Design a protein with these regions (language model features):
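Histidine-rich, glycine-flanked metal-binding segment
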Residues: 1-50
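Divalent metal-coordination and catalytic microenvironments
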Residues: 9, 25, 46, 57, ...
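Di-metal (Zn2+ and/or Mg2+/Mn2+) metal-binding site signature of metallo-dependent hydrolases
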Residues: 47-69, 214-215
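Active-site gating loops and adjacent loop-to-helix segments of metal-dependent hydrolytic enzymes
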Residues: 64-96, 172-175, 221-239, 262-267
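Alpha-helical scaffold segments that flank or form the walls of functional sites
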Residues: 66-118, 126-138, 163-170
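Metal-coordinating catalytic core of metallo-dependent amide/deamination hydrolases
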Residues: 90, 117-243, 247-248
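C-terminal active-site-proximal or functional interface alpha/beta core segments in diverse enzymes
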Residues: 240-271
């Protein structure tokens, strides 16, 4: 017996009046006029059924925190990061969970069933990690939540970032994150990419780095990330997030960079 049978729906590929048979959480048949008993049956009334939305870059630990501890008067990224630093000492596992769960439920209601969320590990208590691991487990029946160990204050710049990141990965965080443009120098940014990619390669994990999140055309950490991806055989497992500086770069340089990114299978999240 099927668990669920959804009748008379339209699919994105143009098929109409299709039935969808579901058992043990998986679609087992797509066809018209499926003849099978089901625990539950829904009449789709000819509505469109599509794959769920995916939010590939989010920060659930800071979701719904507008005005805490105060408003961002300048509206800039740097003030936003500073405000998050002011809020961190006031955080509790429960407060993070409450906001994150509310955001997850809101996302589910809008058709988003997969979220990749960065979680700040530059808090020696790892409260956000603990909270979002609990959220991941609670939301598991409804939402695929992937967590990225994110050194918000800089992997080399923050003294215990390496230790905290490894602790977070040991607890079950899924992806290695980074923020090379927030290190003190370009060379330290490159060094952070190298070390973080080596950690990911050693553990068989994916990488998702905030990269070049500025208007500076000389911020070219995506090139280093692409190189390390190739060097360590991480092809297809690495994401560059933001990549804002690319719009300011010289066209000739970008014409060289883009093929290298494609060759390495770099995923880009321009958000």
């Amino acid at each position: 017996m099927l668990d669920l049978l959804v009748r008379n729906v339209n699919l994105p590929d143009g098929r109409k009046g299709v039935d969808i048979a579901i058992k043990e959480g998986k679609i087992v048949q797509l066809a018209k006029g499926i003849e099978a008993a089901a625990v539950s049956e829904i009449d789709g009334q000819g509505y469109l059924v599509s794959p769920p939305f995916v939010d590939s870059h989010f920060h659930l630990d800071s979701a719904l925190s507008l005005g805490q501890p105060r408003l961002n008067q300048s509206g800039t990224l740097l003030e936003g990061i500073a405000l998050w630093g002011e809020l961190k000492p006031q955080l509790t596992v429960e407060s993070i969970k409450q906001r994150a769960l509310a955001m997850c439920r809101w996302s589910i209601s809008q058709g988003t069933l997969c979220i990749r969320s960065h979680v700040d590990i530059c808090d020696d208590r790892l409260l956000a990690v603990e909270a979002l691991l609990e959220v991941r487990e609670e939301m598991k029946p409804y939402l695929d939540l992937q967590l990225v160990a994110f050194p918000q204050d800089g992997f080399l710049r923050y003294g215990r970032a390496r230790e905290n990141l490894l602790r977070a990965l040991d607890k079950g965080v899924d992806v290695v994150g980074g923020i090379p443009h927030f290190e003190r120098t370009m060379s330290e940014g490159a060094a952070s990419i190298r070390e973080l990619c080596e950690i990911a390669a050693a553990r068989g994990l994916r990488v998702d780095m905030h990269c070049d999140e500025s208007d500076d055309p000389q911020s070219r950490h995506i090139e280093t990330l692409t190189y390390e991806t190739q060097r360590l055989g991480l092809n297809g497992r690495v994401t560059g997030s933001h990549l804002t500086s690319m719009h300011s770069m010289d066209n000739y340089y970008v014409s060289k960079l883009l093929p290298l990114m494609c060759e390495a299978g770099i995923h880009a999240v321009a958000k």
